[in-house]
A protein has these predicted regions:
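Extracytoplasmic soluble-region selector
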Residues: 116-202
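N-terminal capping segments
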Residues: 203-328, 332-338
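...with weaker cross-activation on analogous glycine-rich loops/strands in unrelated enzymes
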Residues: 340-414
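Surface-exposed, short loops/turns at beta-strand junctions within beta-sandwich domains
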Residues: 88-95, 172-177
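N-terminal Sec-pathway targeting helices
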Residues: 1-13
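Low-complexity, Gly/Ser/Thr/Pro-rich intrinsically disordered linker/tail segments
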Residues: 419-451
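Beta-strand-rich modules
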Residues: 95-106
């Protein structure tokens, strides 16, 4: 008996171990499955949660739910059945909480998933900016994100001796040159090309009538090209083929261009004339007329071609003077650069001849019209008397004044200027106002003032 006792004990031990094993297996087989989270990751806009469940669980079904972080779990929430031990959640820029539950209503909050987030895209309102020295621009940065993303922006200038940038993204031009300003958010970045140039000046609140007249041949082709780029950028920013685009062209030439354009009585024009002349007291083309490379645009000549600031014979004054713009030459230049095609025409009120006063709603100007609120920045003005003869454009307005851009021939305001006129007596100088809504169609990003 003693000899077989060890074998009996061994057999009983094995039976006990087997019984414990199957007892454990049986107990785990029928008790609720509790998942063990193995991996949580975010790819693009999908949060993926992987989990494991003990091998012997009979009921391994699990269900997934996302809820806004501000919301509580409700009885009528719709849970999605997990597949292959994985839950996938599509998210957006809201903050969510994520949950798993089994068939026994045991709910587990997946805390790691709630703190995932990334930046999906960065965009700016302008990818290239042009600044005068000491000029500033604050870009509008749009951040697209999903989940719990850190939207802290780090601004960097590649050359802070040319242009600096502060923590709020305000860019300041310091000296001539080109550089990039970069906005970094998490793992994404976007760059803005910055051109700083002394070819333009800061726009003063009041027109500087003391600035020098443009001289002949002071600009290179590259200068002219860059100024044309800046002009186009200014117009596109507020809206090409809009009221604002036309106003911006006038503001640029009078305020941002550093020289005053002289008045030059036209030697002729291309519209409504048998004897056609192009670019002599006018320039019915996009861009500025500063370099001889622009001669290729000129279709007809009388005494030219000569760029603005260069002298040639004036057939009206019977003397040589610097080329520039007469009143209708200025207004047609403004219109064509703003995106419109009125034709290279004049300013009078002439039956049977197309004039600038034929555009828009020609209205006799008086105090009633002023008080009606119908007059807007961008409307044209005609003087003197019912026969016309002079044309101008309103480029600014405040409570008391209209600010009028025009090319004048009388001292002390000879050339392209902006002058303030009281709303109480402006109509004493201008007989007609052309209300231009029907012509422009759209206002664009119109502002009453330029500052």
């Amino acid at each position: 008996m003693r000899k077989i006792m060890p074998y009996i004990i061994l057999i009983l031990s094995l039976i006990s171990i087997i019984a414990l094993y199957y007892g454990y297996k049986y107990r785990n087989h029928y008790t609720p499955a509790i998942p063990s989270i193995k991996a949580v990751k975010l790819s693009d806009n999908v949060v993926e949660v992987k989990y494991e469940i003990e091998e012997f669980k009979k009921d391994k079904d699990m269900y997934c739910l996302k809820k806004l972080a501000t919301e509580q779990i409700e009885e009528d929430d719709v849970w999605t059945k997990a597949q292959n031990n994985k839950c996938s959640f599509i998210i957006d820029d809201n903050i969510y909480n994520f949950y798993l539950k089994n068939n026994y209503n045991t709910i587990i909050k997946i805390n790691e998933a709630s703190y995932l987030g990334n930046i999906t895209n960065l965009s700016v309102d302008k990818e290239k900016v042009y600044l005068a020295i000491n000029g500033t621009h604050t870009p509008t940065l749009t951040i697209s994100s999903v989940g719990y993303a850190d939207k802290t922006v780090k601004w960097i200038s590649n050359n802070d001796s040319i242009a600096s940038v502060d923590s709020n993204g305000k860019i300041k031009g310091l000296k001539n040159g080109n550089t990039k300003v970069i906005a970094k958010v998490m793992d994404k970045e976007i760059s803005i090309d910055v051109v700083v140039t002394n070819l333009i000046t800061l726009r003063p609140k009041k027109f500087n009538n003391k600035k020098k007249y443009l001289s002949c041949n002071i600009y290179s082709k590259e200068d002219n090209d860059l100024l044309d780029e800046i002009l186009k950028d200014r117009i596109n920013t507020v809206g090409y083929k809009t009221r604002a685009g036309v106003v911006e062209a006038a503001r640029f030439l009078a305020l941002e261009f550093p020289y005053k354009i002289r008045y030059f009585s036209e030697n002729g024009r291309m519209g409504e004339r048998k004897y056609k002349v192009d670019g002599e007291g006018r320039y019915y083309h996009e861009g500025l007329y500063l370099h001889s490379s622009r001669y290729k645009n000129i279709k007809y000549v009388s005494q030219g071609p000569k760029t603005w600031g260069c002298t040639m014979y004036n057939r009206v004054a019977h003397k040589r003077s610097a080329n520039g713009l007469d009143c209708s030459g200025f207004i047609t230049w403004v219109l064509v650069n703003g995106g419109f095609d009125p034709g290279d025409i004049g300013a009078g009120v002439s039956p049977g001849i197309k004039d600038l006063t034929d555009y828009g709603e020609k209205t006799i100007f008086n105090a009633k019209v002023v008080s009606s609120g119908k007059v807007k920045v961008g409307d044209l003005l005609s003087s003197t008397g019912p026969g016309g003869g002079h044309i101008a454009i309103i480029v600014g307005e405040d409570d008391d004044y209209y600010y009028v851009a025009e090319s004048l021939w009388t001292s002390p305001n000879v050339g392209v200027v902006i002058l303030p006129y009281s709303k109480k007596n402006l109509f004493k100088r201008y007989y007609y106002v052309m209300l231009m809504d029907s012509y422009y169609k759209e206002d664009g990003k119109l502002t009453k003032l330029w500052y």
